[in-house]
Amino acid sequence: MLMSADSSDSAKTSVICSTVSASMLAPPAPEQPSTTAPPILGVTGRSHLENALKLPPNTSVSAYYQHNSKLGMGQNYNPEFRSLVAPVTDLDTVPPTGVTMASSSNSPNSSVKLPHSGVIFVSKSSAVSTTDGPTAVLQQQQPQQQMPQHFESLPHHHPQQEHQPQQQQQQHHLQHHPHPHVMYPHGYQQANLHHSGGIAVVPADSRPQTPEYIKSYPVMDTTVASSVKGEPELNIEFDGTTVLCRVCGDKASGFHYGVHSCEGCKGFFRRSIQQKIQYRPCTKNQQCSILRINRNRCQYCRLKKCIAVGMSRDAVRFGRVPKREKARILAAMQQSTQNRGQQRALATELDDQPRLLAAVLRAHLETCEFTKEKVSAMRQRARDCPSYSMPTLLACPLNPAPELQSEQEFSQRFAHVIRGVIDFAGMIPGFQLLTQDDKFTLLKAGLFDALFVRLICMFDSSINSIICLNGQVMRRDAIQNGANARFLVDSTFNFAERMNSMNLTDAEIGLFCAIVLITPDRPGLRNLELIEKMYSRLKGCLQYIVAQNRPDQPEFLAKLLETMPDLRTLSTLHTEKLVVFRTEHKELLRQQMWSMEDGNNSDGQQNKSPSGSWADAMDVEAAKSPLGSVSSTESADLDYGSPSSSQPQGVSLPSPPQQQPSALASSAPLLAATLSGGCPLRNRANSGSSGDSGAAEMDIVGSHAHLTQNGLTITPIVRHQQQQQQQQQIGILNNAHSRNLNGGHAMCQQQQQHPQLHHHLTAGAARYRKLDSPTDSGIESGNEKNECKAVSSGGSSSCSSPRSSVDDALDCSDAAANHNQVVQHPQLSVVSVSPVRSPQPSTSSHLKRQIVEDMPVLKRVLQAPPLYDTNSLMDEAYKPHKKFRALRHREFETAEADASSSTSGSNSLSAGSPRQSPVPNSVATPPPSAASAAAGNPAQSQLHMHLTRSSPKASMASSHSVLAKSLMAEPRMTPEQMKRSDIIQNYLKRENSTAASSTTNGVGNRSPSSSSTPPPSAVQNQQRWGSSSVITTTCQQRQQSVSPHSNGSSSSSSSSSSSSSSSSSTSSNCSSSSASSCQYFQSPHSTSNGTSAPASSSSGSNSATPLLELQVDIADSAQPLNLSKKSPTPPPSKLHALVAAANAVQRYPTLSADVTVTASNGGPPSAAASPAPSSSPPASVGSPNPGLSAAVHKVMLEA
């Protein structure tokens, strides 16, 4: 036997040429028990183990191991016997007539090891040789011929003693094993061997890698012999049930990592994967033979072979592998075997066209309720006695939805139809063999297509209507054709008419539905081969049926298949509308839930905190919600379509009560967007038809200035018509703020309600929000031309934050307190001062409205007013970011201090006409005298110029706000300077604290408060207002603690708890310094004069202490003023006063929050303003009137 030292490539095949001469049958040696020498049997393989692995299951291989290293011919070995082996890479290269052999005299002693698979010869007795099984006995060769030069003869001189025991054992086995001992590799037929010419061609490595191979491992019942290279005996005893390691051929210990392997290879593979070992590349062309005796020589090739035989990297775990792993893998293999059986059965079923056709037709008739017979009776009944359905909204083209139908009812009504399509898909031959992912992909993509094909017969074009599932008839003109839904309705009816004109049979409809579902071009499919095969077979069945039913229409099938793209387009449009509706429907449900909660808690809000006086606490929540923001290009022009803005300025005209909208949107069913408008939730204010369709039914209250300038829509509100009279009086307000960059006053003041707080949520009207959702289908139907596009102003900002929304609400409450003075006391006039938001001079509302309505969008953008304040625009843009909030707080303080130091007494404004409604009115335009005084003061702030200017000259400072602030600001203090200043102030306070008194009795008494020398501007103000006597009570100066990182707004709320209880013009005891302590927030960027040097010097009872006079209207003087957030507030009639005072405390952290309410009958009517110290900005500055019957309370805040 010749064993090759080098292993050849597995793709090569080995050709075994053996010659048996007549002299081979000579008697053997005397010591042999047998009298005849058996012929030679050839088996290919690299080694004993590899040959053993190639044997089929349940095959005895005892005879295979009889010759381990040499042929047992002994001295009787015929020298003329030649056994030649040559590598062949292609079966076609094997000569069909055999290979000639060289004479033994040419090279009788030459022995060359060929680099190919080794050859093992096994002798077999001719007496037991049979022909009914496949054999590999090589034919006897003819007289020797010339051989090619590359063939060499085998050595034929071998010792005899080594083989006597083996031959005896072989003969013993030959007597008990009559079956052939040499089998072909698994999976190969006998025809693969070419016996002609004595040449047998066997692939060297031809095992199919299938799970069945696991069962084909050889069962060893003898001892494995060593090879010719002197390898020691393996001495592996097999008990008849043991398999070999797939990697090295050793005894397998179990099923490890997906294959049978020994403990050594199992541990080697686990260590290699877990430790991620990178072995050195093999130096022998990566083709090392991995055996038990040399498996540790080349670790690179060993790991490579582990992976090649099927060891799984994913199966490697840390810790003990459970026993269920083997069971799972075996179950998967069995399942794979079953799947292959099912695939073979499926192939048979798909190839049988009549059987496939019968299966699909049976599935269609069992799962479809809309066959020809059923639909024909339904259509006839609908034509004879129609029962028309007129739904306000349509949930589905074939399912009329009553107004109060819920989503659950709709789903339950339509679920069985969808279930029928799913069951039909499951009954299509081959569908159950697909993976779950492929099933889901096909059903998700083709469910609507197949459903629409089934329901296409429900469209009756003769009466231009739809027969619904419940038998009712719905006319086409009854369907709401709003927005882009008109295109979908028209396309649906056209497609239905086109399909119905083909007059398809049930078999054709069923096969067409199957083709629509089983389509191989869906994205995400994995088993494309099976799906394509199913599609082609189903298409062939449809072609057969069409040819059978319509022999005169050869192009009918192509015409039918051309409808599939249109069907997919309709499905896409339907899906888009469904997605849009789901998003908006969820938002509507959320808003309705908010409305219910707010309606239940509206009274509690009046008694809990001053925030109840805001227009609606939910408006703040809406502002905080990211869905509340609408881009400026999508915001509707709600201002110009509302009747409130069409009234003359200052004229109150009552409008007749109009009908409220029905519960159309509140009870919107699931698929409202399918055939109805783009969305019932969007109140698109069409300017062209708002008088008869939009605003005639509902009053949409919203600020155009807020929509266009700020770019932020805080939930347009639908209110009762009883509030239209209140809203008609604020037409001047919309235009007074139309160029306000922030727009907070306009939006919030319009949302301010009457004192009873019967706002729109408690009244039951629905609130809608325009969403940032994509357009429904992208196909415009032409009815959008009347929509008012938003004026795209340069000051728009699509950013907002919860804090800015709260600031807007606080500004609203300031304006509310001011308006109550004007309403109840027309002789008074108030200027509303906001540290950040500043109103602009008003323009003609009619002229601007006509300009905007008559101009295209592009002209509106080009003719937009210029930016008045670029710095405010940047501040608005950076507002949502947290890292700019600290800087914004400092700028607020700067603006507050500047406003307080520059407010003059000539800011008296004249109100318009007397208002009878408690809705707050807008800020009136200041007279030219006040504007001139404001422009002439060089120390005035940007905020004050925004308030008082009426000429273009006054806007120079606001146009250069940064320069103006820089010129007005004093040098900034470094942190060290601030610390030294605070230490000095603390020392001064300690010296003056001994003379302080914390009790007050009576109206005119004052407790001494510590104060430092004010800066020059403050001194000037003190000299100016020193003669003005005020009645106030101040508590002891609180301790100041420098906390640059504290938030002034949040920390100042704790200082607003100074209790004030007075029944009749009496002051209450003020809080102690500990009760009213507040962290003092001083900014290094502060530019005001007051914040740099806080007041620290003591003042007498009659000294001119810098005071701020805040006028607040309280109807009942007997009701005390309570600024505590935790204690209940007074009734709503006094709510505006509380909010105004609370705002002053919350917004100005540098103020002392010691508040006292006293009764006063006013002062001279010609007084312009109250004292305004430099360190505290006024929230509302005005003058009392002695002719008033109601008491006007003065809330005094100490600076």
UniProtKB/Swiss-Prot annotation:
Ranges of the DNA-binding region feature: 242-318
Subcellular location: Nucleus
Induction of the gene: The expression of this protein is developmentally regulated and is correlated with the 20-OH-ecdysone induced activity of puff 75B.
Location of the NR LBD domain: 352-600
Bias type Polar residues, positions: 993-1006, 1018-1040
Main location per the UniProt record: nucleus
Alphabetized InterPro entries for the sequence: NHR-like_dom_sf, Nucl_hrmn_rcpt_lig-bd, Nuclear_hormone_rcpt_NR1, Nuclear_hrmn_rcpt, ThyrH_rcpt, Znf_hrmn_rcpt, Znf_NHR/GATA
Keywords assigned: Developmental protein, DNA-binding, Metal-binding, Nucleus, Receptor, Transcription, Transcription regulation, Zinc, Zinc-finger
GO cellular component, one term: nucleus
MF terms (GO), sorted A to Z: DNA binding; heme binding; nuclear receptor activity; RNA polymerase II cis-regulatory region sequence-specific DNA binding; zinc ion binding
Any one GO biological process: regulation of ecdysteroid metabolic process
Start and end residues of each stretch annotated as Disordered: 130-182, 624-665, 771-808, 831-851, 895-961, 991-1104, 1155-1188
Pfam families, alphabetized: Hormone_recep, zf-C4
Zinc finger (NR C4-type) boundaries: 245-265, 282-306
Biased composition (Low complexity): 139-149, 162-172, 641-653, 792-804, 831-845, 897-942, 950-961, 1041-1077, 1086-1104, 1159-1187
Function per UniProt: Implicated in the regulation of ecdysone-triggered gene hierarchies. Probably plays a key role in mediating the regulation of the larval molt by 20-OH-ecdysone.
Family statement drawn from the similarity comment of this UniProt entry: Belongs to the nuclear hormone receptor family. NR1 subfamily.
Protein name: Ecdysone-induced protein 75B, isoforms C/D
Organism: Drosophila melanogaster (Fruit fly)
